[in-house]
Amino acid sequence: MPNKKDIDNARKNRLELIAAGLSRRELFKMGLLTSAGYLVAKKGLSSRAWAYDHGKGGGGGDGGGGGGAASPPTRGFVEPLRTLTVKQPVASLNPAPTIQPNTAAGEGRTIAHQAFTKFPPQKFYQITQSQISATVSPDLPTQTFWGFDGETPGPVYHAKYGEPILVRNVNNLPANNGGFGNNTVSTHLHNGHTPSESDGFPCFFFNSGHFYDHHYPNVLAGVTDPQFAATNGDIRESMSTLFYHDHRIDFTAQNVYKGLVGQYLLFNQFDTGDETTGFRLPSGQFDVPMMFADKVFDPNTGLAFFDLFNTDGILGDRFLVNGKIQPFFQVAPRRYRLRWTNTGPSRWVQFFLTDPNNLSATFPFFQIANDGNLLPKPVQVTSVELGVAERADVIIDFSKFRPGQSIMLENRLEQQDGRGPTGNVLAAGQGNNYLRFDVVLPAVADNSQDPATITKFYDLPTIDLSNVVRRTFQFERGNGQWQVNGQFADCNTNRFTVKQGSTELWTLVNSSGGWMHPIHIHFEEHQIVSRNGAPPPLAVERSRKDVVELHHNETVQIFFRFRDFTGRYPLHCHNVVHEDHAMMALWTIGQTGDTNPNP
Amino acid sequence: MPNITRRKSLAFLASAPVAGWVLGKESQAAALAPEHQWKQVDPREQIRQRYFPNVVLTTQDHKKVRLYDDLIKDKVVLINFMYSSCSQLCPRVTQNLVKVQKLLGDRMDRDIFIYSFTLDPKHDTPKVLKDYASMHHVGPGWSFLTGAADEMEMLRRRLGFTDPDPELDKDKESHIGNVRYGNEPRQLWGACPGMSHAEFIVESLTWVDWPKGQRALEP
């Protein structure tokens, strides 16, 4: 609850506005007032009200994560949603890619490609990381960010199963970081079934002035398993929505906050990218990636501010979609596939659709994918929760709304600090609006299939616990330090080795009632076997995932098959501030494994 | 329509930043667009102002030093918080940092420095800290620092060695065990647990070191 001072301030400000002639209804429409009568940016949502929190603890003199800054005012919904550029291949790369690292030509890779011959790249891309200028709002000055090909989020890859690609990643980031960020980088393809040396392993970062060739085979898990030889892997392991982001050990939060993030889509014969074929999912301009982020902007300079000395989690009070603060999105009255990614750094969200003129209305829609993996079939929902790095593909049918209607994409999950959400879901209209849909475009053809009538995407792979290696991971905090089984991230320590071709059952434990963690495990998708001893209660969790939400005092068991490639991978908390403060264990897939139960 | 002045709206907004702000009319949008003159602040100066108040501290050798001018500016540093009567974590971290110090060799006291700030300035006088340092065989380039209680507490908060749980934050035994490492002019700041392997702490420090060991900035 807001404290007395907050309430007094809210009342004072509200009276001032009402005295100025605004009705409560108008205030609400302006986003200035909640239905309960408090100002929208009350403590707990604005993350960081400097005036309230100053001196109450935390990096930089406060507890909210912004380091003593509350962003200057910005208007919402004055700029359109930015359509992300689609990345185009090049005819060839010079010098030509090599299996061994081309150190002489300036490649920062140190390990040979393990699957280059088996899956020779058919398309080539070159992408450059550099300092860029970007505007996030007409009410803030031009920002200096780091981006890919001059943009943040970077361009979207449109990749296809069965079409291996090679991405030459060029690092032109400056030595002068403008206050935060480390210009040695490692770009992780999040969710990718990628050989270790191309995965973006946190310790495989490379220097500015160099390049790094990432080989993405774009193969289904099980591709080397003879039982799936006919289909080049297990079709049930198909992925759709991936993203890429910097993963530099100790500096991931700074570098992602600075802009090093983008989307990567994978298509196949069912999820075709053409709404007249396959699963007939909305395609083309109706298939829209939305990358969410929250940031703080310095009230004096107007520039994005990163609290260097925060170790709990950083919450922003400005909400960005595809690099713009609170854009509007003009839509036609038809179905859209929206691909949602929570890029953090630390905030959990739960998105609802809200009609600001009718707060009691609820609007169901369909979630079709969890963490970028199509569900067994669409699930009708009224909200979607996303921890950091979780993704959800949803289908919203805007023909169900009135022509001209405006609908907010509203995060109603209350969160006051980096520890995680409070557990309260705020009433409609009291949360934070990330984006406004305006149903104003003319009617157009819709050849996509109504998700209510889709009965099947992919079955879930079987879970076989008969011969699993069992391991337990405790995610803890001791003396303010983040730990996995009492240990810390260390590039020189391999915590355990999984035998290639084996199955494992991992038990992830969060014994804390104070902290929540979105845990990400690289390389293989897992399935949740149990959440606190019972099958996962949410239909959307009966799915394939790569991030597990570890809520307070939870124990979650997850099942894996480890196949196809070998090498080093991490498991870590994806609250990137926790991650950068050592909440990560590095492990290996090898020809022989161990059975260490508490690595 | 509302008759709200820009001054009023900004005063209001300054007191409570607003998440979403929809305007009814285009003309209003233009009228309310900030005519703000954004300040240009050097990021290095901004970091100094935000995190490194230039308070006067006393070393274990009774030397008066200023936090920014004498300890942080132009240096590569390791920072932690401890207190001499701490029986659990501090002695282990101190021993670990002694290993780090040995690994750093002659760069210690030249361009790399370790600072241990006391959480217990009332008890941890320079003499007490001197005894503590001697007991742990601490070498040159590593200062144990004490000062006025309120300033030490401000430093702890500024440098982010706090817990959001007020009960834990009050409990010195559960104090934050991280070691912050950084290079002040390069604006590179990271952190690692005080009980990380000493070799890895040193490796982490090399990540923010001068390029090729030269104390100069790349263009």
Question: What is each stretch, according to the model?
Answer:
Chain B
Residues 94-114:
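Conserved helix-turn-beta segment immediately C-terminal to the redox Cys motif
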Residues 69-89:
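Short active-site neighborhood of thiol/selenol oxidoreductases, capturing the structured segment around
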Residues 56-76:
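A short beta-strand-turn-helix
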Residues 1-17:
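N-terminal secretory signal peptides and thylakoid transit peptides that target proteins
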